[in-house]
Design a protein with these regions (language model features):
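N-terminal export signals
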Residues: 5-28
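N-terminal maturation segment of proteins
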Residues: 27-678
Length: 678
């Protein structure tokens, strides 16, 4: 599309709807010079860094409800990130200044217990020249903030990841607006938000065309420098995602807004402006998709997803605070796969005997076939359509809450409910089910358990059979993510601001993933917690068939370790990762090769492709589930041993959740110091 004629048409449309008064909002905000001098105390420095980072990352600010945290973030819902090179250079300069102050104020007691967190391009930090006595809470925050700053300097300065962050560019505008609407106050009678809330949505939508022009310039600079996104990201997140965005802004956004606006005096003009902004944004997204098709070769032979072993290990050490190297993690993954495969064999053997299926589990081949036969047997009880699928998930959530009340696992409010909603189309390429929490710094809004519809595909519905639902409902709902985030949000004033940050991005290839260790670790821990035997409940909350799927969920996260390390250290190709996944998670060897003539193999291979694609673009995220879960278990057992007979699992869980979304390694010693005999 011709850029000049496109802008001329956009201006005519804007005049027709009275939008020109907001056209300045379409341009990026002026470059903000970092405020100097920086504070000399850690708490003040932490707060300055927190505010600055959210000012520069307004969609992350929206996610956290930053406008409810500080007046300095009041306009964050009206903006998209300024990715212009000068703005990013100013950002890097600020982070380097912060790093220098952190080095000067570091007390010896805060020396990392894990490998050094210095980014690859930085020299080793000099010994601190100022000793600042920090409280135990501040020491936790210091370690975390130090890692965050190192990551941001590395990502922006060393990797220049913004030159290839294609999925970030595509997802941020949608997510920002989706989260805005999610957080709007419920005014009753189906109405959401006041005029200022919708004005912020409008201004952010109007900013999209200029935002995409900056993205194009950065991507072209990356192509010139050889800093190029993988072909799969170009096609799936880039081209397909841009087209999904075009449809969302052109059609879905105004349709979504209409009932929420209602018949209030400002509703009709606002809807007209949103419609006009959506049309303009839709055209910009269509043009962006065309740009990507013309700029990149989606059929090129080379793969560009692997981070490389040195980079991968740096992320493991700095972001996840785990001391292990890639080789050790790769072998650890294989051991975890063997562990949970053996557990599945045991349960499948028992199920087969009780169901009189006559299966043998003597040889390795028989074990694989036997597990698959049992799961095929369970898959016969599949939903007839997506409506029934969603009902099963909601029912499983209610059942899990009732079980939690029955065994007094947590103090559960009577009004607690779990909401399950369809995944927005723009996110469906990467997730089957996921949870997005309410913002910690605002009272408005509710968490969302996203479930991706199958489109009533019989083979895909078969993969979501009745026995498979409970485990996912536990992980994403209760006592997994929904319960975890609700508890943390209720105690947000007791959790340091820095612990909520998601440096780089909330959830895409730019993300640091530090928060994934405690949050996804808790989700997986919850699955296992609900499986603990209780009187008349051999498999805890689960039926035998459901428990088999719970074990498969544990196995899946073990496979992720092997695959994630393999992909990013080039121990596995993309296709080898798919084959490993289908063999060890689905017990369906060669599903990829048989997909053309076998609908079940095709559904399994397609699901595996989506999973491997996600791991390929999110290095280290996939390993956080298992690593995070086992860190919680180790902490629990250490606390149990130190506390003795007075140990309370409920108290332990509340204390853990009260630490906020920060890896166990950052607070282990402080936590255990309070685990004393009653």
């Amino acid at each position: 599309m011709n850029r000049r004629s496109f802008l001329q048409r956009a201006s005519v449309t804007a005049v027709g709807f009275g939008v020109l008064r907001n056209v300045q909002a379409c341009a990026p905000a002026p470059v903000l010079a970092p405020v100097t001098p920086l504070p000399a105390t850690f708490t003040a420095l932490r707060d300055r860094f927190f505010i600055f980072h959210l000012q520069r990352n307004p969609v992350t600010s929206t996610y956290l409800g930053g406008d409810g945290y500080s007046p300095e973030l009041a306009d964050s819902n009206m903006r998209l990130r300024d990715y212009r090179p000068q703005s990013l250079q100013d950002e890097i300069r600020f982070y380097r200044d912060v790093k220098a102050v952190l080095v000067r104020m570091a007390p010896a007691a805060v020396a990392p217990a894990q490998p050094a967190t210095v980014a690859p391009s930085q020299p080793a930090a000099a010994a601190p020249t100022v000793l600042a006595p920090l409280t135990p809470v501040e020491q936790i925050d210091y370690r975390l903030m130090n890692a965050q700053v190192d990551f941001l300097i590395h990502q922006l300065g060393d990797l220049r990841y913004y030159q290839r962050a294609l999925d970030t560019y595509v997802q941020e505008p949608f997510r920002g607006i989706d989260w805005q609407i999610q957080q709007m106050p419920d005014l009753g009678n189906g109405l959401l938000g006041n005029e200022s809330d919708w004005q912020a949505v409008l201004i952010r939508a109007q900013a999209i065309p200029v935002y995409l022009e900056v993205a194009k310039a950065n991507l072209l600079a990356g192509k010139t420098a050889g800093n190029i996104p993988d072909k799969r990201m170009v096609q799936r997140d880039g081209i397909t995602g841009s087209k999904a965005n075009a449809d969302y802004f052109r059609n879905t956004l105004p349709k979504t807004a209409q009932p929420f606006l209602g018949t209030r005096p400002f509703a009709q003009p606002m809807l007209a402006q949103l419609t006009a902004a959506g049309i303009t944004a839709g055209a910009a997204w269509d043009a962006f998709a065309d740009f990507l098709s013309q700029t990149y070769d989606v059929n090129e032979a080379v793969d560009r997803f692997a981070s490389g072993e040195a980079e991968y290990e740096w992320r493991v050490h700095n972001a996840l605070f785990d001391p292990r190297g890639a080789a050790e993690l790769y072998e650890y993954g294989a051991a975890q796969v063997a562990l949970y495969t053996a557990k599945m064999v045991e349960v499948a053997r028992e199920f087969s005997a009780e169901a009189k299926m006559g299966l043998s589990f003597n040889t390795d081949a028989e074990k694989n076939i036997g597990i698959r036969r049992v799961m095929d047997f369970l898959s016969k009880d599949s939903p007839k359509d997506d409506n029934q699928l969603f009902k099963w998930y909601r029912d499983a959530g209610e059942r899990a809450v009732a079980y939690g009340r029955q065994f007094n696992l947590f103090d559960i409010p009577a009004e607690y409910r779990l909401e399950v909603v369809p995944t927005p189309p723009v996110l469906r390429s990467a997730i089957d089910a996921a949870y997005y929490p309410a913002p910690p710094f605002k009272k408005a809004g509710a968490g969302r358990f996203y479930l991706t519809p199958t489109g009533n595909d019989p083979a895909a519905l078969k993969l979501n059979n009745f026995a498979s639902v409970a485990d996912t409902a536990v992980h994403e709902g209760f006592p997994g993510h929904d319960w975890h985030y609700r508890y943390m949000n209720q105690h947000a004033d007791q959790i340091s601001n820095i612990r909520w940050l998601t440096p780089g991005a909330v959830e895409d290839s730019s993300a640091m993933w530090t928060d994934s260790m405690p949050t996804e670790g808790w989700g997986l821990y919850s699955e296992e917690l609900m499986a603990e035997p209780r009187p008349n409940h051999k498999y805890g909350f689960y039926s035998p068939g459901e428990y088999l799927y719970e074990l498969q969920g544990q196995l899946l996260r073990a496979v992720r370790i092997r695959v994630d390390v393999g992909l990013h250290t080039q121990r596995m190709t993309f296709d080898q990762a798919i084959d490993y996944f289908t063999e060890h998670v689905s017990f369906y060897p060669n599903a990829r090769l048989n997909a053309a003539g076998d609908p079940t193999a095709r559904a399994i291979a397609d699901s595996a492709y989506r999973a491997i694609y996600r791991y390929s673009k999110w290095p280290t995220q996939a390993i956080t589930y298992n690593l995070g879960k086992n860190a919680i278990i180790e902490l629990r057992e250490a606390c149990r041993a130190a506390t003795g007979a007075g140990f309370s699992a409920k108290t332990f869980h509340e204390r853990f959740m009260g630490m906020g979304p920060v890896p166990v390694a950052h607070f282990r010693d402080t936590f255990l110091a309070a685990c004393t005999p009653a």
